[in-house]
Amino acid sequence: VDRVDEAYFREQIAPLIKGPGVQFVGEINERQKIDFLGQAQALMFLIDWPEPFGLSMIEAMACGTPVLAFRRGSVEEVVDQGVTGYIVDGIEEAILALPHVVALDRRAVRRRFEDRFSSTRMAKDYLRVYKSLRAPRNLKQVSSRAEPVDAVAATYHPAE
């Protein structure tokens, strides 16, 4: 817990996690995170705000760990229902979905991560875009001689 949040953690969170079944591990480094996520039965991503990406979901799936998440923000773009995890609309639904989440094939979770989020897949996508930009197009030729950039830019009208 960082300094800004210490008082909040001490007053609001710590009393809730003193019982059995909950262990606060604190901050962990990257190596520890891989081990931690890889040994988890699931990542519980039950947040109340519209997270724009949710890197922790991707990190869990990279370790083969399925995700149980509320339908918020980017969750539906990241989690493949019934393959890499389950998307739910509330706590009651999360409780019912948990046995299904932990039963998912962790190898399939990892494979889907590789297919969708790996650096190899992203690099291939970038190459495909670069090659498409390099391909001949039906561009309007402004002039056979070099012109100032402003003059060329003034003739560019993207499709609307």
What would you call each of these model-derived segments?
Residues 86-107:
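C-terminal "capping" alpha-helix adjacent to the active site of nucleotide-linked donor transferases
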Residues 54-57, 75:
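Short glycine/serine-rich donor-binding loops of glycosyltransferases
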Residues 38-52:
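Acidic donor-binding loop of glycosyltransferase active sites
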Residues 27, 36-40, 126:
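Short alpha-helical donor nucleotide-sugar binding micro-motif in glycosyltransferases
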Residues 8-35:
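Nucleotide-activated donor-binding/catalytic signature segment of Leloir-type glycosyltransferases, i.e.
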